[in-house]
């Protein structure tokens, strides 16, 4: 009888140990095994409606260096980063650099996102990050999350949390 209990307990422990791997195994993977949202992964196919009702699509970003910024109006580090990203667009947009801000929608906004962006001087496209869009980027672990893709659509830099604009710019310049 003790042997049966030990066998059952052993199987239960082994079974539960494998449960922790669900998040990584559910992420979309390329043929080469790179999980979505990880360095070396490709810019996913996505489309969204921006805050003013215009369509944003990954198709429009092909051949450009792209910075995807996941943000929220309640996120203080986001408020610090976004004006710097606008300055990068102003400086490098004519050289094929684009920024798309994807608004994380987990909490009720205390501020209208359009007015929020206007106060910060942000003019690059801003859209709502639906659950589907977040999943295509591999899930979002924290805000802000910044993803920098090269012209071939390969993820070259990923930052979860605040990053200084000059650090992003130093990573951006060689990709242009």
Question: Which positions does each model-derived feature cover?
Answer:
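Structural microenvironment flanking redox-active thiols in thiol-disulfide oxidoreductases
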Residues: 79-120, 129-136
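N-terminal targeting signals for export/organelle localization
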Residues: 1-45, 157-158, 171
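Short, acidic, Ser/Thr-enriched surface-loop or helix-capping motifs
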Residues: 37, 50-51, 149-150
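Thiol/disulfide oxidoreductase modules built on the thioredoxin-like
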Residues: 115-123, 128-173
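Short pre-active-site segment immediately N-terminal to redox-active cysteine/selenocysteine motifs
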Residues: 64-66, 70-74, 81, 106, ...
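A short beta-strand-turn-helix
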Residues: 40, 45-66, 89-92, 135-137
